[in-house]
Curated annotation (Swiss-Prot):
GO function terms (MF aspect): DNA binding; excinuclease ABC activity
Source organism: Chlamydia trachomatis serovar D (strain ATCC VR-885 / DSM 19411 / UW-3/Cx)
Protein name: UvrABC system protein C
Subunit structure: Interacts with UvrB in an incision complex.
Subcellular locations according to the entry: Cytoplasm
Length: 598
């Protein structure tokens, strides 16, 4: 129904769902209500809703549709389905497609191994497995694998390699595997070792930490300082990932603690995972434009998040009371979790910690206030430039030339959408920019920007305009920004902008909000370009020195550990053995290469 024709008298007082749409019919927001008439009155009546983000939503809303249901449970389920279907901008919509880092022990093999996996849920074909986690990062996951390899000598090879091996591998020589593949240990001995490793993963880390501390002390006494430092880093990671913190009062429970930070329309949700008494870490979900009440936000978030999570805890702590008592029973689990707002001191401490973590995630965005209105008027845009792309390139004397594109969308940098380009054309910066822009806009697999910003002057502006015209792309505003040579005032840089309105360029005052915003974008693009260049340059360095029989992966591992070829060649045999994948034959090759005259 058109909003100007909308009458609250015609709205049912039953439970239901409402859809707010713009003039194009796009669904902006989906909400549920116990009483549709009362809920919609809070939007339509003056001073009915005090939330700052609501006027912004209502400015864009031209139509409201309602769907009446029998009860609140139906309303929750319908709301969730409609959010998934329409993906409205102002709702909680989980776009974080990352899976979870876990450690898996497959029980289908007579000699189980522990491996790192990324999963959304238990695979149907692999029900006979134990899962440990999820862990907050890959680093934490692989650090635990490294500890297990050091202290619990279980096999790490694939099932195929296990079945075909004829003799023990180098890990057996290093006492990091019992070599069950060739029958050098009994089933009982192997199972006892596996049980100890599983006990460690369940939280019994005291003996392992004690052994690591002794190993660090021994390495220091023997002046093997690099080895001691590596062990210390491992110990630190174990303590961060496994050690019990101030949540010991809850060690009998698995708890997720949800926190929320808001600023304007920005909402950030944090999820602290407390697993068997251990605070593992947090995951964060950022919603740039959210118009839901806190209670509705958490209800919607819980329904979506735990539909994808391989583990549903026994309890979920939230900072506000939810008005959906049936919510736990809508989750796909045999044992519905308790969802509550804790009243105990420790529960409040955890909620405060979750809020603090969410607020920390907002810090990079707090200083960014895009001057959308000024941009729209200055460049005569038909709408706010919600998606902006900024381009830069980097090289050193023409070598390892790289280009990058960074994305600023809905008021936030979007690193997931950043792109890098290895430039193949040989020439000046103009040729490099032309290649990058052509490759970006020839492939229309991603959303087009409203505005593109380029680090450059008049020539870059003309080239960019020509490329967009050749590709028949309209509605994209091009701006280039360049330092004005010889025009500085007390460390405030004078910058000149080139655009369609000012093709000859215009100088903006250093305090201009538009100029400062563009400088922020350019600095981020430059940072990302330098980062990508260094990675490419480092990869090229790996190929400058080659040892016959030592591949790129092993070369990288050697240089990561020893930092230079000189230190690789003077390393002892025992030190070289600590590098993953290095065999006795490899050590012989390294020593032979190091013995050659320079």
């Amino acid at each position: 129904m058109r909003i100007e024709d909308f009458s609250l008298k015609d709205v049912s007082s039953s439970p239901g769902v409402y859809l707010m749409k713009d003039s194009q019919g796009t669904v902006l927001y989906v909400g549920k209500a116990k009483n549709l008439r009362n809920r919609l009155s809070s939007y339509l009546q003056k001073k009915g809703d005090s939330r700052k983000r609501i006027p912004f939503l209502m400015k864009k809303t031209t139509d409201i549709d309602t769907i009446v249901v029998s009860n609140e449970t139906e309303a929750i389920l319908l709301e969730n389905n409609l959010i998934k279907k329409y993906q409205p901008r102002y709702n909680v919509l989980l776009k974080d497609d990352k899976t979870f880092f876990c450690l898996s022990v497959s029980l289908e093999h007579p000699w189980p191994r522990i491996e790192a996996i990324r999963t959304r849920a238990l695979s149907p074909g692999k029900k006979k497995q134990w899962l440990f986690g999820p862990y907050v990062s890959a680093e934490a996951c692989y650090a635990l694998l490294e500890v297990i390899s050091l202290w619990f000598p279980l096999r790490t090879c694939s099932d195929r390699e296990f079945s075909t091996r004829q003799r023990p591998c180098v890990l057996y020589e290093m006492k990091r595997c019992l070599a069950p593949c060739v029958g050098l240990c009994s089933q009982t001995e192997y199972q006892e070792t596996l049980d100890k490793a599983v006990l460690f993963l369940k939280g019994d880390v005291r003996s392992t930490i004690s052994n690591l501390e002794k190993a660090i002390e021994k390495a220091s006494q023997e002046q093997k300082f690099e080895h001691a430092a590596a062990l210390y880093r491992t110990l630190t990671l174990i303590r961060q990932t496994m050690a019990k913190q101030h949540v010991e009062k809850f060690q009998a429970y698995d708890i997720d603690v949800l926190g929320l930070y808001r600023k304007g329309s920005l909402a950030i949700v944090s999820v602290l995972s407390v697993y068997s008494g251990k605070l593992l870490g947090a995951r964060y979900f950022i919603f740039p434009e959210n118009a839901q009440e806190d209670s509705a936000l958490f209800s919607s978030f819980i329904l979506q998040y735990y539909a994808e999570n391989p583990r549903i805890p026994k309890e979920i702590f939230v900072p506000v009371s939810l008005d959906s008592p049936e919510l736990p029973y809508l989750l796909n689990t045999a044992e519905p979790p308790k969802i509550r707002c804790p009243k105990t001191e420790y529960g409040k401490e955890l909620l405060a910690l979750a809020h603090k973590n969410a607020a920390e995630q907002a810090k990079p965005f707090n200083s960014i206030t895009p001057p959308y209105e000024e941009l729209q008027h200055f460049f005569n845009l038909s709408q706010y430039p919600y998606r902006i792309e900024c381009y830069d390139n980097a090289h050193l004397q023409g070598e390892h030339n790289v280009g990058v594109c960074i994305v600023f969308e809905n008021g936030l940098f979007s690193p997931k959408q950043y792109r890098t380009f290895s430039i193949t054309s040989h020439g000046d910066d103009l040729a490099a920019f032309e290649e990058v822009l052509t490759r970006r806009f020839r492939s229309l697999t991603t959303e087009l920007p409203n505005l593109i910003v380029i680090d450059g002057g008049r020539n870059q502006f003309k080239r960019a305009q020509r490329i967009l015209e050749e590709l028949n792309l309209t509605g994209i505003t091009v701006v280039t920004i360049a330092k004005e040579s010889g025009n500085h005032s007390k460390s405030l840089r004078q910058e000149k902008l080139f655009c369609e309105t000012f093709p000859q360029g215009i100088l903006l005052h250093p305090t201009s909000a538009i100029l400062q915003f563009f400088q922020l974008l350019r600095d981020e693009a430059h940072r990302f370009a330098i980062q990508h260049y260094r990675k490419k340059h480092a990869k090229a360095v790996l190929t400058t020195k080659k040892i016959p029989g030592i591949g790129e992966v092993k070369t990288k591992r050697l240089l990561q550990k020893f930092k230079s070829w000189k230190r690789v060649f003077i390393a002892s045999e025992e030190e070289l053995k600590t590098v993953q994948g290095i065999t006795a034959k490899d050590i012989q090759r390294i020593q032979e290469e190091g013995a050659k005259p320079e």
